[in-house]
Design a protein with these regions (language model features):
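Secretory targeting and sorting signals
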Residues: 1-36
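Residue-level hotspots at or immediately adjacent to binding/recognition sites across diverse folds
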Residues: 24-406
Length: 406
């Protein structure tokens, strides 16, 4: 999804597969794509050539972590799910000395799904339910004041999707597909979006972007298929209202495959204010022979219009950004793109055998979220390691820390 200007990145999914031995950089089951010989584009020289996710914490239950919030080196929160026949939400906290399980705040009520952690300012944290379809639970939020959890007195109405905070008095949230809610520190205000949106990026108080798709207007006409050809859509908030922004169309050549549609699923604001958007032009696969390949959409706002963004090399070609540090971009799938355009695969370790993972097991690391530790260039990630082995597969919730060099 998009970077937040406090150095917080929201990650849809980061996946990488560990082989049966070593920490290698194999990409066999990752879905990542590579070009050229032996990956010279993915193995640059210099300090960026060696990045590794190392285990910071391995939880003592079968399950996964779904979110993490890093308020300080000694104040880290993680939420996840324990799989013990029935799924149970779990809350973990690190106080600088050890990780401990904490009870979920009573303000949330009963919940099976792990809640989501939202950093809204300096050491300010909100805990909200997932959009699970339960209207009553959707409005039960909790807030952390540095000492205790309490009920949030004014949660946003509706069922919140994407959530972006530039500060405790400047918060945006998607409510359904075509409504945006804004918190000014006192109250929530709803505004109507021109089109359906799936993602938000906050550049500044009067500079907010939303992206999604539209089913009306130029490029949506499609003869003989009984439906519209959805097109990429983008919208901009200028401090007064949301306005539709002209967005390049995407369309397969004739014959158009079944149920073709195009849209933007991610908008990302760099630290320098540059805005990028990503999406796909796809269709319902398996209905015709000689199918075309899905098309990857990558756009950059040049200050007045959207222009096509140059593709990255090697395994970074179809990856989207999930975070930014001082030297480049973290991409989904555990890839890293340096500022000078080099593509690096982030390495990873295998679980120790003490966890029950056998030496011959197949292990895959899935990260749901990465965060910069405030005031540092250290990064933490949260997710799980899936261990596939005969008779005793399991999932280990993990927090990982990025190691540079060595």
């Amino acid at each position: 999804m998009e970077i937040r200007h406090r150095g917080v990145a929201a990650v849809a999914v980061l996946a990488t597969v560990l082989g049966a031995a070593g920490c290698g950089t194999d990409s066999g089951a990752t879905g990542s794509r590579s070009t050229g010989s032996a990956g010279e584009e993915g193995r640059p020289k210099g300090s960026a050539a060696s990045l590794t996710w190392e285990f910071e914490h391995i939880a003592d239950f079968d399950g996964e972590l779904a979110d993490v919030a890093v308020l300080a080196k000694d104040d880290i929160w993680a939420v996840g799910t324990e799989n013990n026949g029935d799924s149970h939400a779990r809350l973990l906290h690190y106080d600088g000395t050890q990780w401990k399980r904490e009870p979920l705040p009573e303000a949330l009520g009963d919940t099976v799904y792990p809640p989501l952690l939202e950093e809204v300012g300096d050491k300010a944290l909100w805990l909200r339910p997932q959009n699970s379809g339960d209207g009553a639970a959707a409005n039960r939020w909790a807030q952390w004041d540095g000492t205790r959890w309490s009920a949030m007195p004014s949660p946003p109405p509706g069922k919140v999707g994407d959530f972006e905070a530039a500060g405790p008095d400047d918060v945006w949230a998607l409510d359904g597909e075509q409504t945006a809610q804004h918190w000014d520190g006192t109250r929530w205000t709803a505004t109507r979006l021109p089109y359906g949106a799936s993602d938000l990026a906050v550049v500044g108080p009067d500079d907010v972007w939303a992206v999604g798709s539209r089913s009306t207007g130029p490029g949506t006409e499609m003869e003989g298929q009984g439906k519209e050809y959805d097109q990429p859509a983008s919208m901009h908030w200028d401090g007064t209202s949301w306005k539709a922004v002209d967005t390049p169309q995407a369309r397969f050549k004739e014959p158009i495959p079944p149920e073709a549609s195009a849209g933007l699923g991610q908008v990302f604001a760099l630290d320098n204010g540059e805005v990028r958007a990503y999406g796909t032009n796809s269709f319902n696969h398996g209905e015709v022979e000689d199918e075309p390949a899905d098309e990857f959409i990558r756009l950059r706002w040049d200050g007045s219009k959207w222009v096509e963004q140059q593709g990255a090399p090697g395994g970074c070609a179809t990856r989207t950004p999930v975070g930014q540090d001082d030297k480049g971009l973290f991409l989904d799938g555990n890839w890293y793109l340096t500022d000078d355009g080099r593509c690096v695969k982030i390495k990873r370790h295998r679980l120790p055998v003490s966890t029950g993972a056998r030496k011959a097991s197949n292990q895959s690391l899935w990260l749901k979220e990465i965060h910069r530790v405030p005031g540092t260039d250290e990064w933490l990630g949260a997710g799980h390691v899936q261990v596939n082995q005969s008779g005793d597969p399991f999932s280990a919730p993990v927090v990982v820390r990025l190691k540079r060099g060595g």
